[in-house]
Amino acid sequence: MSSTLLEQTRSNHEEVERLERLVVEDLQKEPPSSKDRLVQGHRVRHMIESIMLTTEKLVETYEDKDGAWDDEIAALGGQTATGTNVFSEFYDRLKEIREYHKRHPSGRLVDANEDYEARLKEEPIIAFSGEEGNGRYLDLHDMYNQYINSKFGERVEYSAYLDVFSQPEKIPRKLKLSRQYMKYMEALLEYLVYFFQRTEPLQDLDRILSKVCSDFEEQYADGIVEGLDNELIPSQHTVIDLDYYSTVEELVDVGPEKLKEALGALGLKVGGTPQQRAERLFLTKHTPLEKLDKKHFARPPHNGKQNGDAKSTHESENAKEIALTEAKVKKLCNLLDETIERTKQNIVKKQSLTYEEMEGEREGEEANTELESDDEDGLIYNPLKLPIGWDGKPIPYWLYKLHGLGQEFKCEICGNYSYWGRRAFERHFKEWRHQHGMRCLGIPNTKNFNEITSIEEAKELWKRIQERQGVNKWRPELEEEYEDREGNIYNKKTYSDLQRQGLI
């Protein structure tokens, strides 16, 4: 309502204090899921940005570059051009307030607490692609396509690209000094920065990259930047030493690529057959470059030194810019190391799944996300009826399919108990429940009865085993009984042996 500078300053201080308390209150709450944690981070980030903007206004007010603050203090003291009159200043401000309410008679009083409470319930919109999985994985498919379709890249699988994209030092230096490579590195850096800002909203990325730039400048000044040589134009004596070659034929054996590099270093034409290249290079053995015919040069040798110096300076600047971009990319890759590793594992896992399994996995992840966001006293959201793991959450869908946990096996011997998955079914034959059921049937729990779950089948098999072993056959030498004078009972075989020995 009041437009005085003093009131605006007081209001700004109050807003900063309220926002600071809101940040503390929000951070004291433990988010139930990773998605909620991400939303909380962006919400706090927005409040911190509001604090910074308001603080900048306060700094400008206290700097008082336009003298408005001194004028405000003087006005509060009633100092005017005609003298000091405190009451006149008071009534002028009172009149201003009354006129404001006359112009806005139905103005609604806005409760500051309601506005700040609404900030705590704010849910910022965070855009992620389907491949990024709410910030769990990187989506580098665009960068991958640029890499495999470029001169500096190789035709590798996407999973292999995830191993090499963070190692630009492995790319030959001569392939980096191209506009294509520069555009690729800039696009890669732009994506990593954007992804980092979305997944780590509370990190001060500007300070991190500023530190990378300062460290790079120090290393560049000392000449220790990895993969960067300050001398971009190679010397003619370091490419091919012509003193070792007496004929053109010997020079041809060096190879067309080395001949091309040597000619390019000297500013000569690099085209033609290997024989023509060797002849052109061999001319420089006994003839200085200044005396060579102009037709041998790729560009006119006129003012060649100045052009060469300008080209060298331009290439040096490009190489420095590329090296700085590489340093930023490597720093971000170090910060996102866990995400990169998680992306590799996800890609390898997807390669072993069918489309239906991937869809089921995606639905399972969505179910788990909603489960995490439920209140502690809420019901477990498990639409796919997945088994509950050790952490109280449904297991991943791919693990569910791997172990065949959708197959039900019932065992009548165990009291019609259900076993889910082939592995659990095979293991239960040695467990206490099945062993107890076999003892109740009077049947030994041997390997012969594995895969037998019906009581009738178990009894029939036991009967056949007994018949095969001759258990039910009459054996008089073992089952016929004899009694001696003292009333001792023996079977026929034992009684006959004792009688032959004269003991009975």
Swiss-Prot record:
Biased composition (Acidic residues): 356-374
Top-level taxon: Eukaryota
Subcellular locations according to the entry: Nucleus
Zn finger (Matrin-type) start-end: 409-440
Disordered: annotated segments: 293-319, 355-374
Sites of Phosphoserine modification: 373
Tissue specificity statement from the Swiss-Prot or TrEMBL entry: Expressed at moderate levels in all sporophytic tissues with strongest expression in gametophytes.
Molecular function via GO: RNA binding; zinc ion binding
One Pfam family it belongs to: SF3a60_Prp9_C
UniProt modified residues of type N-acetylserine: 2
InterPro entries: Matrin/U1-C_Znf_C2H2, RNA_Proc_DNA_Dmg_Regulator, SDE2/SF3A3_SAP, SF3A3_dom, SF3a60/Prp9_C, SF3a60_bindingd
GO cellular component, one term: spliceosomal complex
Family affiliation: Belongs to the SF3A3 family.
Function statement: Splicing factor homolog to SF3a60 that may be involved in pre-spliceosome formation. Is necessary for gametic cell fate determination.
The protein's name in its UniProt record: Splicing factor SF3a60 homolog
Source organism per UniProt: Arabidopsis thaliana
Gene: ATO
